Amino acid sequence: MLMATPTSRASLNLLRRSPKPKYFSSSSCHFRPSTFRKSYPCPIWSSSFSFCLPPPRSTTSTSLSSSSFRPFSSPPSMSSAAAAAVESVVSDETLSSNPLLQDFDFPPFDSVDASHVRPGIRALLQHLEAELEELEKSVEPTWPKLVEPLEKIVDRLTVVWGMINHLKAVKDTPELRAAIEDVQPEKVKFQLRLGQSKPIYNAFKAIRESPDWSSLSEARQRLVEAQIKEAVLIGIALDDEKREEFNKIEQELEKLSHKFSENVLDATKKFEKLITDKKEIEGLPPSALGLFAQAAVSKGHENATAENGPWIITLDAPSYLPVMQHAKNRALREEVYRAYLSRASSGDLDNTAIIDQILKLRLEKAKLLGYNNYAEVSMAMKMATVEKAAELLEKLRSASWDAAVQDMEDLKSFAKNQGAAESDSMTHWDTTFWSERLRESKYDINEEELRPYFSLPKVMDGLFSLAKTLFGIDIEPADGLAPVWNNDVRFYRVKDSSGNPIAYFYFDPYSRPSEKRGGAWMDEVVSRSRVMAQKGSSVRLPVAHMVCNQTPPVGDKPSLMTFREVETVFHEFGHALQHMLTKQDEGLVAGIRNIEWDAVELPSQFMENWCYHRDTLMSIAKHYETGETLPEEVYKKLLAARTFRAGSFSLRQLKFASVDLELHTKYVPGGPESIYDVDQRVSVKTQVIPPLPEDRFLCSFSHIFAGGYAAGYYSYKWAEVLSADAFSAFEDAGLDDIKAVKETGQRFRNTILALGGGKAPLKVFVEFRGREPSPEPLLRHNGLLAASASA
């Protein structure tokens, strides 16, 4: 997922992907989506999903001083008044040592704390306001006099705000929350001020209407068109009274989305179940018991062990999932499931009223802009329309329904044959447990027994080897080159085939429930940019971070991953590749910037397909103790199990996408239906087992209420069609033909990964594939092609 949404999960089925398929999107992205950062979360089945930095001075030196980030480096045209305003800010003794305001090569994640946020952000905003005023006075409809100074303003805010927003996601404290909450309205006010600037808007329109328009590159034309459209969507055409109302709505939406995600995090942290009786945890694997004992030790039970306890279960994914999959204790499964399903739905952490207010304000915003509903606003910057999105969801739902019904019948029959008392009354806290038992029986695969073959170091080695084969890049550790926010964070350098650095990325792999948001996401730190390059460099190199929440090392063992966790790492790496391998030098359309939201999941979901490719899987599946490769027969079983319960997993994702669209098209805040009524109604056609009456999954659906996926969750399925078809190009070329794979990989790199937001995604896809996308490969990969043909 692109970080734009802390990922929330309502049940294990949400966390588990459909056999093919942010969060937490930085809430700073409510405005000007092509210029302000977004991050991209995984879909709910996995675990959950900033922008721009500098290149080294040379290919051999580790010094990055020639490209340091300088928050107060003034453009040459800055007036003396603006310069004086900057000087008054910088000269303040309390600010001179503020890490948010210092020149840096890489963000000083290790030295920023809550005390720096208020003074640092306010000083930065004062400086940027002076720059904006100067730009408005001197703006001309030319690239050097409009786009370049605008990019500098946007970039400075993006990088610095992205730094503190990232720390809030991975190193949360009450003090940091409070500081960000205090300055957030001022940051939003500036973003609105920038987005609604008439001089800038008119200058962009003048460029579009000039005789030189046709001579501009496609990337520059896309940039101009996006700026004009986004200005309209941010209210520039409204009269003063309506624009003031619009701005109040945006401020309130920003606050509400932050509060929503904080409530989800706090509610997730709040639940802890202490178990002292080993009978209660029968069936749970040693890896889970070790994790539970480790949690108990951290809570003061110093003598806790995996064998004898005590054990603490939490709602964090590495803890929650094993309970739902393996606990024979049905009462325990029910308790944990209900706790997970009801997160942030009661007491001080209740998100119900927040959801209602968010939906109400989004509808008001849409009406002010002249749209019928918020979904139309959302789709204005996407590939799809409301009608096309609904059409795709219904086509996939029809192809999935009968298979999902049969899945449930198979599950009940299997449970009955095993003598399960619940076989005739199977419900939500039973399906995951019995699905795991059926999968073990049918394919002789136990996911826990696979863990020793998927140690994190081997998985990363194999992933980097695949990237070299497909895209001709080398990835090497660069730990110590950049400050990090936790000792477990790794830092890597990406090099081209000539050995030149072209990008960098951080990787934060492990769950830290006490301070880190759940889920998995990729986000930008800095983007590739010609304008932001420092003296002596032609372009600033992109930097990304990948964040996961997988099982941490237990005892002296490395992190041993489930296959789902392996897929998640591949997924986030796909996002990072599109950010890092861009060839666009226009910073506002480089990498993932300005790509339509329903196309950004293409590279991430494409990369997941390689987890099932034999040579790739065998390169990462090495037993952590013996070095033994995963047995061939086990690989074949894993491949055969790929479409296991495909209809059920597909339907689950379609439910999330459908309720999202319904809430943003037909739901009337304050009307006869509640949000939960809508959820129940949509579930009639998208869930074989009806949801519980007390189902409150919406209260933790961060993708659409605290991220970038409002009226956009369908994007996972939309992009799934694109990604499956893209992977089929490699199948057509021959997956065993290394020469053909390399050639196809280079073509993928030169189109999908390189062109960024500078070209319409459909054009990019056609350039790679030679034709428009087809849903056939997706249905074939999921084993649903026959169902589709008869639907």
Curated annotation (Swiss-Prot):
GO terms, biological process: proteolysis
Binding-site list for substrate: H703, I704, F705, A706, G707, G708, Y709
Active site, UniProt feature: E572
Activity regulation as described: Inhibited by salicylic acid.
Transmembrane stretches, start-end: none
Enzyme Commission number(s): 3.4.24.70
Predominant location: mitochondrion
Protein name from the UniProt record: Organellar oligopeptidase A, chloroplastic/mitochondrial
